Amino acid sequence: MLPVINNLLSWILPARETIAARASIQARPPLQAVGINDFLNLEIPAREMLLAPILPERCLAMLYAPRGLGKSWLALSMGLAVGSGTPLLRWSVPRQRNVLYVDGEMPLVSLQERLKAISVPFGTDTPNDGFRILAADQIDGGINLSSEEGQRSLEPLLADVDLLILDNLSTLCAATSESASDAWVPIQNWLLKLRRREIAVLLVHHAGTNGRQRGTSRREDPLDTVIALRRPEDYSPEQGARFEIHFEKLRNRVDGGGAVPFEASVENVGEGIRWSSSDLKPPLLMQAAELFAEGMTVREVASALRISKSEAGRLRLRALTDGLLVAELQSEDSPVRVQ
């Protein structure tokens, strides 16, 4: 009898799903195309900026970086900036908005300690509901946003939210394969629904071994903004959170405005922190190539750049290999010229 019941269930359950899917399609209004003139005359509200010029209203964005570089420090600070209406680094905040920050990784005590330090520069400007935190460490079983059930569980918290920050994809969507593009579709559909509801979303993610965002590139297709954090060439661990901010995608910024990369760093000040920014220095390789092109020797370049002679020699060889320089002679200190 049991095999018969199992066979019946194997037929009934898919049939029910098919019927439900058809009913859902039939319930939708018919599709309607709009003519070009009618479309151009539609009164569509312009998108204001949440964090100008990189995060507009109703945007989908990603911030990614290698582990331990400081992406959560930056994501938390971006959220507090929007939630308090306070500028951050080289970005302005036209007006205060409501932010929900969903953390899927940090222990609760670490998250609290970090937020205490980050919140000091913002003073008392942040309304209590301007920046709200949902931490997986407070929830038995954590948070699984790769399932419809997990997505629905956020609904009561999204009513007045302008910006939703998900930190990070690996922990909040752990049930989904990072490399399988089809597995991303249900999450992408949910994100697009949030955008239609005028909720902006910032995804925090890890970089892979190749330096790109880890997993399927399909994630980037609907995104308005993609921000990559990279380690400076002269970085050392004792410097803490110090990184280069690069903008790999800024949709609708055809003039390149706001897309200029820069360096950001954090320093401890009393019980809080302070962010600072600076223009990017030319990469060490480019600096060395320019000095070699001026006729400097390996020893002179090493002294000018405050690096070892062996490092200067390696940079010279790499510049030659990459075609940045062309040697006229074959000795170590032979003159070179720019290719």
Across the structure, where does each feature detected by a protein language model lie?
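Short, small/acidic-rich helices and loops at N termini and domain boundaries
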Residues: 1-28
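C-terminal regions of RecA-like/P-loop NTPase motor modules
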Residues: 12, 16, 159, 196, ...
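The Walker A/P-loop phosphate-binding site
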Residues: 22-118
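Amphipathic alpha-helical transducer elements in NTP-driven molecular machines
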Residues: 48, 105-108, 112, 148-151, ...
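Phosphate-binding/switch region of NTP-binding enzymes
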Residues: 62-63, 68, 73, 182-268
